[in-house]
Amino acid sequence: MSRILSNCLKSVWRSLVLAVSIFVFSCLLTYPALAGIDDDKYDGNVFVLYAGNGSLVPARISLADSLKVKKPALIVFYVDDSSDCKKYSTVISQLQAYYGKAASFIPVTVDSLELNGKYPNTDPGYYYKGAVPQTVIVDKDGKVRLDEIGQLSFEKIDDTLRQVFDLLPRKE
């Protein structure tokens, strides 16, 4: 009888140790994400998380369609795991507040572009230079008015868009 009781206690003890071990191991595997705006770790779409603007992605209109209806387009090439792109997303979101109805905003994650792809000039991939963030402004006639890599200021892009729309210069 004592032998049966001893075996039963050992079995319960082993099951308890196994259950605790699985619990501790699963807690270690599911620790919260450590990504933030100042690092290059992926934690979701930059426009949704850092700009607070999920309406930018996915783009509502293609570049080809925007040019067909003679609407200027602002193309932004980005990746979700770049601190520069995370910080820059707020600038693009602010611009959309002012120009969202007059211009097409086309954010393009470079992960979606084909490597060595041949693109027509009506496809955003045609303008990609290989670095992010990259901002391209194409006017209603398809002419490139701005094509720069890096984080641009709101004012720089605003100045270009004011020229595209023939608006008065911004007052400082």
Residue ranges of predicted features:
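Bacterial N-terminal signal peptides
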Residues: 15-28
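Thiol-/selenol-based redox modules, centered on thioredoxin-like
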Residues: 147-172
